[in-house]
């Protein structure tokens, strides 16, 4: 089965996680998408976030090892990676924790129905898929640990 490499970012602001309501999939999900040719996962994530919701973020969990010698750049470490089915093919998804820089400028594009900032307790709503809930809780915990 064909497997695409994709990224997703759990964007945190004021101890809430942003989820988008995807129009085509009719699911509440983190912002994300495919990694294009000649693009790093970090570049893909920043691009997808800008295209889908129009804001800037800081990707957290970056390496503190100096980028010296033959190293072009350090990439953030995903907090979770999985392979899941999307019908006729699979996605290998790298999940990241992000800090919203300008959340007041958030505006969804036409791929999305809606967005919502979810507090920890709000993630128990029926419309939040179990995997997204679990990943959101892990992202919130990691975010708070990284900023302590």
Question: Would you name each region that the model predicts?
Answer:
Residues 137-148:
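Compositionally biased, intrinsically disordered linkers/stalks adjacent to structured regions
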Residues 16-58, 64-65:
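Conserved Nudix-box catalytic region and its N-terminal flanking loop in Nudix hydrolases
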Residues 94-99, 104-139:
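NUDIX/MutT-family hydrolases
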Residues 11-14, 22, 98-100:
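Active-site beta-strand termini and strand-to-loop segments that position acidic
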Residues 1, 9, 84-88, 106-108:
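Short secondary-structure boundary/capping segments
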Residues 1-17, 37:
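Conserved N-terminal beta-strand and adjoining loop/helix that marks the start
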Residues 4, 30, 52, 87-93:
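Short connector loops at helix/strand junctions that flank enzyme active sites
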Residues 69-104:
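Active-site-adjacent beta-strand/loop module that shapes the phosphate/pyrophosphate-binding cleft
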């Amino acid at each position: 089965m064909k497997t695409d490499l994709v990224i997703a970012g759990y964007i945190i602001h004021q101890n809430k996680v942003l989820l988008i309501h995807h129009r085509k999939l009719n699911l509440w999900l983190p912002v994300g998408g495919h990694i294009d040719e000649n693009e790093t996962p970090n570049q893909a994530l920043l691009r997808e976030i800008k295209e889908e919701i129009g804001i800037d973020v800081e990707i957290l969990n970056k390496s503190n090892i100096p980028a010296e010698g033959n190293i072009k750049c350090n990439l953030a470490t995903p907090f979770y990676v999985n392979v899941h089915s999307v019908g006729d093919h699979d996605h290998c998804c790298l999940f990241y924790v992000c800090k919203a820089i300008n959340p007041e400028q958030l505006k969804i594009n036409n791929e999305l129905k809606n967005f919502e900032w979810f507090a920890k307790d709000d993630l128990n709503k029926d419309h939040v898929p179990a995997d997204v809930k679990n990943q959101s809780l892990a992202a919130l915990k990691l975010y708070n640990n990284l900023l302590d």
